[in-house]
């Protein structure tokens, strides 16, 4: 059977589906790159916030419309199924199979046979091959979460924090490097917690050392580091030559009152000291963060504190979102809900401020030369990234040329708010 795999949501889903594709192939199936060539589709869904849930449902319904026109099997997996599986089965009976959070191998074994929605998620898997199309690959080092952020429902459907064995992760990365991957992106709900459940201590520094020791010319990028648990040892581990000086630290807010309501255990002063420590250690550090605006109880004064915080830190990369009121999250019951129109205004103001910061930073890049990877080519223009940018969520460097694999040197010739333009230069 020809399978098309449609990945929605976060990079952790991409990591899961890379393995799922390999297991489907082991069962004698083919993986195709377009739905037109497929006999079956697997949709890996997101169930985190309202917009993601809407997107997942719309995608399912789109494929079911195709199913009316031709012979097409539709299978759905991922967080949305784990969270709402029984309800979905009743509401959308046309789907051929539902699979909650399971090891990819188990999904491949049961697809076409029976639906499986486990009472307790089973997210941790052992490496068994994978199929990737890009020069970069997401590698999931743990799943689930033991944090108790008041806005978040992930622990409810992902379960408690569970780390993969370090040898298995290294084995997967070795496979990826041998297959030609040039960027390894480590993902988890909180990468700083890696290893605590298995080894009794934070093992991210040891994992980075083990991966850094693998022969080859490649990058290591770390995503999703909780600011409360970034130790000096973790910061020092970024000194390994293959580890990018890219610190993805979702701080969520800059007001101490709002941080407390979010059940974040540290205050903004801790974050400021952490940022200072990182920038003192690495002059070329790039800091990325995520912000939630419109959290219940967020006043105009709190938002002004957030703006002042952003102006003070000057994050190189920032993503911001309006609070999503999830019925199973503790914050759902909080008073002081912010009207949507006010939350949108605050988001617009925040992003306008960040756009100024981003443009000022980008202007300083003009004339500099960076080592880059090309992600794709569109009409003779290459979409490149330096160490400063993660795939899909950050900016790009647009370069004239034809796609080639491997690393290249690009000199920046002009800057925009979030993106750069450049030209290939000789080594």
UniProtKB/Swiss-Prot annotation:
Record-stated family: Belongs to the methylthiotransferase family. RimO subfamily.
One Pfam family linked to the record: Radical_SAM
UniProt-annotated location(s): Cytoplasm
Keyword list, A-Z: 4Fe-4S, Cytoplasm, Iron, Iron-sulfur, Metal-binding, S-adenosyl-L-methionine, Transferase
Positions of the Radical SAM core domain: 131-360
One annotated GO molecular function: metal ion binding
A single GO BP: tRNA modification
Organism: Thermosipho africanus (strain TCF52B)
Gene name linked to the record: rimO
Co-factor: note: Binds 2 [4Fe-4S] clusters. One cluster is coordinated with 3 cysteines and an exchangeable S-adenosyl-L-methionine.
HAMAP family: MTTase_RimO
Catalytic activity, EC: 2.8.4.4
General function of this protein: Catalyzes the methylthiolation of an aspartic acid residue of ribosomal protein uS12.
Name the UniProt record assigns to this protein: Ribosomal protein uS12 methylthiotransferase RimO
Domain of life where this protein originates: Bacteria
MTTase N-terminal domain mapped to chain residues: 1-116
Cofactor(s) in the UniProt record: [4Fe-4S] cluster
GO cellular component: cytosol
Positions with a binding annotation for [4Fe-4S] cluster 2: 145, 149, 152
Positions bound to [4Fe-4S] cluster 1: 10, 46, 79
Domain TRAM: 363-426
